[in-house]
């Protein structure tokens, strides 16, 4: 699992006793959407802020649009098109997917998308922005089989902004709790909010029963031909 491996790696680095370690560069200082425009690679920091990554090529992550954790430094350069010009110290992609449609019933959704326990963790990376819902989630792992995580739309006919997080442990032994990250592209998956902020409700089956939480959500401005890389993980592939 890329996200889990990343977090573990960062934890390991934090135990390094080397006095030369630059701790400001060990941990991520931003959650971004990686985008390209012509021959430029830029990072969408939030709904209004763009960062031109001068030391990154637009073909990073195969030229696909993904959410990512990044550690960057500001530069003194100016740009007429972007809010800031930055130097990327390191960047690591997050599993980035499109939501899936409800099959019409809880039984059908459980058979297709799973009904394993999952927890959503309150964290700075658990956020709805730039047309994405990014989640830090917690689940039981055994390390033997691939897990699947999906966001199901159309679960409430009366509210198109209600979605459901589904986890399929795929028969993996439930030995230990571990955290991971996933980002869902909500653009074209839920109705455009027309510039307004609405409540996006997400529900899930936790170890304490079913839960719900609301996010403030506003559709982003359209971009030309965004390319998604579904299930992309840079360092591991045991979650899809």
Regions found by a protein language model. Name each.
Residues 10-14:
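C-terminal motif of bacterial Sec signal peptides marking the signal peptidase cleavage site
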């Amino acid at each position: 699992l890329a996200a889990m491996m990343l977090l573990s790696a960062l934890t390991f680095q934090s135990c390094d006793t080397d006095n030369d370690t630059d701790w400001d560069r060990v941990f991520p200082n931003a959650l971004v959407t990686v985008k390209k425009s012509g021959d430029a690679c830029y990072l969408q920091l939030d709904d209004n802020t763009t960062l031109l990554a001068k030391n990154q090529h637009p073909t990073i992550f195969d030229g696909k649009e993904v959410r990512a954790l990044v550690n960057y430094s500001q530069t003194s350069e100016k740009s007429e098109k972007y809010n800031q010009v930055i130097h990327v110290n390191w960047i690591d992609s997050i599993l980035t997917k499109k939501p899936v449609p409800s099959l019409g019933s809880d039984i059908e959704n459980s058979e297709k998308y799973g009904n394993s326990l999952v927890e959503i963790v309150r964290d700075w990376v658990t956020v709805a922005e730039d047309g994405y819902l990014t989640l830090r989630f917690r689940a039981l792992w055994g390390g033997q089989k691939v897990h699947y995580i999906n966001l199901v739309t159309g679960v409430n006919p009366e509210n198109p902004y209600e979605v459901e997080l589904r986890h399929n442990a795929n028969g993996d032994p439930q030995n230990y709790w571990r955290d991971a990250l996933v980002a869902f592209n909500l653009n074209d998956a839920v109705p455009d909010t027309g510039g307004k902020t609405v409540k996006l409700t997400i529900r899930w089956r936790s170890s304490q029963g079913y839960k719900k939480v609301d996010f403030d959500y506003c559709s982003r401005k359209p971009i030309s031909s965004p390319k998604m890389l579904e299930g992309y993980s840079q360092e591991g592939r045991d979650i899809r």
